[in-house]
């Protein structure tokens, strides 16, 4: 059972020196550092410091990696307002008939009825109304831009990859580097960052060892940009995100001879969300999920996790704490800072094996 501190947002604060925030990815991808969490019977001092390539020694034949195959859209676009001036839109999600929810900057200068010209084109957009739930704007795009697949060609012409605000760089290489090697289904506005560590060489080596790969889809959306502001975490609610867990994934998990390992928190949310919406049993599912995973949660599917280092007081920190324990996780973060690990999207990774998770929180 979680203690009272586990249920307070302030308990998930930690100090991160700014120089520990990764501003660029390492090359090759698998050369990122890997903090290996100790088993629950060991002290924090037993953590090991390796490279992502060393997952080859940690994973076994018969294990199954579940990855998120979402592809990041070039969703940040510049528009010229009819009254003059340039604004920025972050295109988030479709609302039907060519209408899209967008975050606007500066928002106060974008009013219902405003006409916008997509920078570098003659394409006209119209601001329809404000979205009260998000503070964003519903914007009318051309009618054929009805979903992520159909708007992607337009965004590829004039958009930019929406790197997180803590990354201060503009590099054309991000269009490729801020995608996983297996990114396939367009729709995200942020990358599932744990997957960025897998190079083609590492994926091939894991396959050669007998490690399986299954693909879910979770389009990382507005929730990524929303800080948790609820101090009492028993009252926490999260923004919904669209997922697909298809029949082939369910079958692969049912037939898995080893351990089910989630690559990233998005894979955890998809698998666990699909299960919890269907009585705790994993079945094929397509639709929105807003599952809150925090200490006290009992996992229905996931047994281990590869993850990046997350922002203080974030929902992702709560999720990882549910698996390994808040105090242990924060101690490992302190060790990572002392050892000069690189944090956040382009940063290093942590491996939480099934031996390292809290007793009784994952399926056998």
Swiss-Prot record:
Pathway: tRNA modification; tRNA-queuosine biosynthesis
Domain of life: Bacteria
Annotated transmembrane regions: none
Top EC class of this enzyme: transferase
InterPro entries recorded: QueA (IPR003699), QueA_dom1 (IPR042118), QueA_dom2 (IPR042119), QueA_sf (IPR036100)
A GO BP entry: tRNA wobble guanine modification
Recorded GO CC terms: cytoplasm
EC number, UniProt record: 2.4.99.17
PANTHER family: S-ADENOSYLMETHIONINE:TRNA RIBOSYLTRANSFERASE-ISOMERASE
Stated role: Transfers and isomerizes the ribose moiety from AdoMet to the 7-aminomethyl group of 7-deazaguanine (preQ1-tRNA) to give epoxyqueuosine (oQ-tRNA).
HAMAP family associated with the record: QueA
Complex formation: Monomer.
Name listed for the protein in its UniProt record: S-adenosylmethionine:tRNA ribosyltransferase-isomerase
């Amino acid at each position: 059972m979680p203690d009272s501190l586990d249920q307070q947002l302030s308990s998930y604060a930690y100090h991160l020196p700014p120089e520990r925030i990764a501003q660029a990815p390492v090359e090759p991808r698998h050369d990122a550092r890997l903090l290996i969490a100790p088993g629950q019977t060991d002290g924090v001092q037993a953590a090991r410091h390796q490279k992502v390539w060393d997952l080859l020694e940690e994973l076994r034949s018969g294990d199954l990696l579940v990855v998120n195959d979402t592809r990041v859209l070039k969703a940040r676009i510049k528009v010229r307002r009819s009254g003059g001036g340039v604004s920025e839109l972050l295109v988030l999600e479709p609302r039907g008939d060519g209408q899209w929810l967008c975050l606007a900057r500066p928002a106060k200068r974008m009013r219902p009825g405003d006409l916008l010209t997509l920078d570098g084109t003659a394409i006209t957009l119209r601001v329809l109304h404000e979205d009260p739930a998000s503070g964003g704007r519903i914007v009318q795009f051309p009618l054929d831009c009805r979903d992520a697949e159909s708007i992607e060609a337009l965004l590829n012409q004039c958009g930019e990859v929406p790197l997180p605000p803590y990354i201060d760089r503009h590099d054309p290489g991000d269009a490729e580097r801020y995608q996983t090697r297996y990114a396939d289904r367009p729709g995200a506005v942020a990358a599932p960052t744990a997957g960025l560590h897998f190079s083609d060489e590492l994926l091939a080596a894991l396959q050669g060892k007998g490690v399986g790969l299954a693909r879910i889809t979770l389009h990382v959306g507005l929730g990524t940009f929303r800080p948790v502001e609820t101090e009492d975490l028993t009252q926490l609610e999260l923004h919904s995100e669209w997922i697909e867990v298809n029949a082939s994934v369910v079958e692969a998990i049912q037939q898995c001879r080893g351990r089910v390992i989630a690559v990233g928190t998005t894979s955890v949310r998809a698998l666990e969300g699909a299960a919890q919406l269907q009585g705790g049993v994993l079945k094929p599912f397509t639709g929105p999920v807003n599952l809150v995973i925090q200490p006290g949660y009992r996992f229905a599917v996931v047994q281990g996790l590869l993850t990046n280092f997350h922002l203080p007081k974030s929902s992702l920190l709560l999720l990882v704490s549910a698996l390994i324990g808040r105090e242990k996780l924060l101690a490992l973060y302190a060790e990572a800072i002392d050892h000069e690990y690189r944090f956040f999207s382009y940063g290093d990774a942590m491996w939480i094996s099934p031996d390292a998770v809290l007793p009784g929180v994952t399926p056998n």
